[in-house]
Design a protein with these regions (language model features):
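Local cysteine-cluster metal-coordination motifs and their immediate loop/turn environment
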Residues: 221-255
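FNR/FR-type flavoprotein reductase catalytic core
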Residues: 87-225
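Short, charged beta-turn/beta-strand-edge "cap" motif at the junction between a beta-strand
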Residues: 53-57, 98-105, 240
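Short glycine/proline-enriched turns and hinge-like loops at secondary-structure junctions
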Residues: 42, 58-60, 108-110, 228-229, ...
Length: 266
């Protein structure tokens, strides 16, 4: 692995695929990357950009959530990403990447019961967040939505770590979230990731019930995203202490206070 130069969001790093394991509809791929303080401080909600390579017919960049980071003084630094099953990631393959990018989920200063809400492939950062919150003494509950029951990612470890896991469909997601919040008044904060419209609605449901929320305002499943702030494709309207404005989640987020999205929709 080595760093080769500057990219739109930071240095372009060569990383090596060390392991790819099947996880239902996905493959979890481990990458060996050069050690550094950015990886040591990485947190759930950050992402990577794999630059396009026109010579290989890859015009657009690929954006991937950081699924987990392991820093070991002996074995080095490993970064996990999640890709569709059979995506062609082979052990020994070398890939270029930029990252970790963005602002991830902030952690509560004290242990607090937390609800994590995810839809589709955006559950990837929440998978890591569950483990981090549990290590901080937080009780964790999950609501996960997918169009196909087979599309849920790696449920077994989530069920071992979380106090409860509720599976639903995108159409029923908001109703289930509202029900969980009503039934468990001790839940203090909601973390959400998914399509922008979905996380905005989750934030609104949370706010209406007096819960703080932190949401991923960047949906990596959107097309034509650059991830480095150049394209403007992810621009969104928000209302924050500075007033109404347009923000670029790949730079200011992707994790933002849920009320930013709720107030902008009014």
């Amino acid at each position: 692995v080595r760093t080769t130069g500057a990219g739109g969001g930071g240095p372009v790093t060569w990383a090596g695929v060390t392991l790819a394991r099947a996880a239902g509809a996905y493959d979890i791929v481990s990458l060996a990357v050069p050690p550094g303080p950015a990886w040591e401080s990485a947190r759930p909600g950050q992402f990577l950009v794999l630059p396009g390579d026109p010579a290989r017919g890859e015009v657009l960049p690929t954006l991937l959530w950081v699924a987990e980071v392991s820093v070991d003084p002996v074995h080095g630094t490993a970064v996990d990403v999640v890709v569709p099953a059979g995506g062609g990631w082979a052990t020994g393959q070398r890939v270029r990447l930029i990252g970790p990018l963005g602002r991830g989920f902030g952690l509560p200063a004290e242990p607090v019961p937390s609800l994590l809400v995810g839809q589709g492939g955006s559950v990837v950062p929440l998978r890591w967040l569950v483990a981090v919150l549990r290590s901080k003494g937080c009780e964790v509950h999950l609501v996960l939505a997918a169009d196909d029951p087979e599309a849920h990612l790696d449920l077994s470890p989530l069920r071992r770590q979380a106090s409860s896991v509720v599976l639903t469909t995108p159409g029923d997601l908001l109703g289930v979230v509202a029900q969980v919040l009503d039934q468990q008044p001790g839940l203090g904060v909601v973390f959400a990731a998914g399509p922008r419209a979905a996380v905005r609605e989750v934030a609104a449901v949370s706010q209406s019930r007096g819960r703080a929320s932190r949401v991923c305002a960047l949906d990596l499943d959107e097309t034509l995203l650059c991830g480095t702030g150049l394209c403007g494709q992810c621009d969104m309207s928000v209302v924050d202490p500075r007033g109404a404005r347009t923000t670029r989640p790949c730079l200011e987020g992707p994790v933002v206070p849920g009320e930013w999205l709720v107030d902008a929709a009014r």
